[in-house]
């Protein structure tokens, strides 16, 4: 199940949040259709902006749109002309006042949507698909928050007559673990042979109690601190029974003799053992 379903929808309310936040009763279908139109409007005209995500939040008379982009300068435009144009188009589409927020993505190499878009752009420029996939994996694995990545391309790869799918993976990508923070991205490359779909899964660690687990501070090969032994000789063990040298009668007598000799007193003789009868 985890291998087929969309990782975002599979983990809603666990590690991921909804990208559209609003409540409606009778206008639910209209709002869903409007959200799809908003995302389509932003994706068609801003291909070069590197939009990673679009979040929509609604109130009674206002719509807030958050655009997460790797190139905010392209979205804003010169003196804000592009941002004003986008805001005007959204207000015309929704019929409400639109609050537009443009947020910059700090690490585009660790965003699955941007990685998929980068691979698709290389495929459109006639770059070999294996080379594009490996380059994307190498750049993503350099990021400290990326624990694993999987990149898959499907279509007429290399201009072949029959379509197929190939993927490369590095690190861990646990798709069926609900606490795993997995980012997913999909993009289509338009080539002369047809469209090639690019899918990217990026694993960024586990989320427990709403917080991402950090890597262990101590390295795996670090040695535990050794406890110092007290000075002096360690008592010897006699035989396989595991008793110490003072655990028998002869041992206790020898120990008392050593103590009395050290104190300057004559040592007491050990009691003689009673002879055992051998009568039959």
UniProtKB/Swiss-Prot annotation:
One of its GO terms (cellular component) is cytosolic small ribosomal subunit. Pfam families: KH_2, Ribosomal_S3_C. Residues 238-280 have a biased composition (Low complexity). The keyword Glycoprotein does not apply. GO terms for biological process: translation. Keywords: Ribonucleoprotein, Ribosomal protein, RNA-binding, rRNA-binding. The keyword Ribonucleoprotein applies. Residues 215-280 are annotated as: Disordered. InterPro entries: KH_dom, KH_dom-like_a/b, KH_dom_type_2, KH_sf_prok-type, Ribosomal_S3_C_sf, Ribosomal_uS3_bac-typ, Ribosomal_uS3_C, Ribosomal_uS3_CS. GO terms for molecular function: mRNA binding; rRNA binding; structural constituent of ribosome. Residues 38-106 form the KH type-2 domain. Part of the 30S ribosomal subunit. Forms a tight complex with proteins S10 and S14. Binds the lower part of the 30S subunit head. Binds mRNA in the 70S ribosome, positioning it for translation. Belongs to the universal ribosomal protein uS3 family. This is Small ribosomal subunit protein uS3. It comes from Mycobacterium avium (strain 104). The gene is rpsC.
């Amino acid at each position: 199940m985890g291998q087929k379903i969309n990782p975002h929808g599979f983990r809603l309310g666990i590690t991921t949040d909804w990208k559209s936040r609003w409540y409606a009763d009778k206008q639910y279908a209209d709002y869903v259709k409007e959200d799809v139109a908003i995302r389509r409007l932003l994706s068609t005209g801003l291909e070069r902006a590197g939009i990673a995500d679009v979040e929509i939040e609604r109130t009674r008379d206002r719509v807030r749109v958050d655009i997460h982009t790797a190139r905010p300068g392209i979205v804003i435009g010169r003196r804000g002309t592009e941002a004003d144009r986008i805001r005007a188009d959204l207000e015309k589409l929704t019929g409400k006042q639109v609050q537009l927020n443009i947020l910059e993505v700090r690490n585009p190499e660790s965003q699955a949507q941007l990685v998929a878009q980068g691979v698709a752009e290389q495929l459109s420029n006639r770059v070999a698909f294996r080379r594009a996939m490996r380059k994307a994996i190498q750049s993503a694995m350099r990021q400290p928050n990326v624990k694993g990545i999987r990149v898959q391309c499907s279509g007429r790869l290399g201009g072949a007559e029959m379509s197929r799918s190939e993927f490369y993976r590095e690190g861990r990508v646990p798709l069926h673990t609900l606490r795993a923070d997995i980012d997913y991205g999909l993009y289509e490359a338009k080539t002369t042979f047809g469209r090639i779909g690019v899918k990217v899964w990026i694993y960024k660690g586990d989320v427990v109690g709403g917080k991402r687990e950090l890597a262990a501070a101590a390295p795996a090969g670090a040695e535990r601190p050794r406890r110092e032994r007290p000075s002096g000789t360690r008592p010897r063990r006699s035989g396989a029974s595991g008793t110490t040298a003072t655990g028998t009668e002869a041992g206790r007598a020898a120990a008392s003799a050593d103590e009395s000799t050290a104190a300057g007193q004559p040592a007491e003789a050990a009691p003689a053992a009673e002879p055992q009868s051998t009568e039959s």
